[in-house]
């Protein structure tokens, strides 16, 4: 094979590869050149080898240059390689510059890498955001439940976006303040008559400390009367006391019944002793006759007394029927 053809083949392949890498980069280089953004052609070419999208970097560089910001392409590349959103950061810097808010590229990149939306934060610094809390229920000292909904106007604090708490913390603190204010009120009517009292006391607590926001105002949107929790608690307590009293009464009744049965058993026991003693009387009389301690007249006198006693018992018995009833 002719060596010239081999050389020609390699030259064609080299031209194709060069055109692939340089062709698209030339258009971006010309675009940056006419826009006043200084980005070297070789720098654009080697961005592909660094796995950096040249189009994104060049367009972001042009955007910053047109806005009067001096940001190097190396800073944009490093932020992209760190996993940041380059276009979002540049847009945030432009918005901050127009709003006269001091924000450096490093600060903006740090906010973006921290997971915050830096552009939204800048916009919230210019146009405060209104956050509506869910319905919060609390009970005043008179036992009446109140349900309140508030609207919190917040502004992003650029200096505390990194490491500062988010909206959830603001909502939780505002809810805690509302519950505390309502709970400290002597009467629910006082809160209904002065709903701004809640806003004033909550604002005095400095709830935005340690957060990424600055609370501008807290407005009570709605206050409704809920349940009479105090009355419900008293009812439940009375019902519990009633059940306790019933249990104690049942216990006393059971003890009284047991005592009654015990006394009946004792009565029967005493009757048995009486019967036993009566059964011994004939034996005692026989012994008295043998020893001469009891005479025949004494015996008959005792029998007469016993007969009279039995007759009186029979006459006085309520179960005895009269002759007319028969």
Swiss-Prot record:
Transmembrane regions: 6-26, 27-47
Membrane topology qualifier: Multi-pass membrane protein
InterPro entries documented for this protein: FloA
GO CC terms: membrane raft; plasma membrane
Function: Found in functional membrane microdomains (FMM) that may be equivalent to eukaryotic membrane rafts. FMMs are highly dynamic and increase in number as cells age. Flotillins are thought to be important factors in membrane fluidity.
Family to which this protein belongs: Belongs to the flotillin-like FloA family.
Name of the protein this chain belongs to: Flotillin-like protein FloA
Organism for this UniProt entry: Desulfosudis oleivorans (strain DSM 6200 / JCM 39069 / Hxd3)
Taxonomic placement: Bacteria, Pseudomonadati, Thermodesulfobacteriota, Desulfobacteria, Desulfobacterales
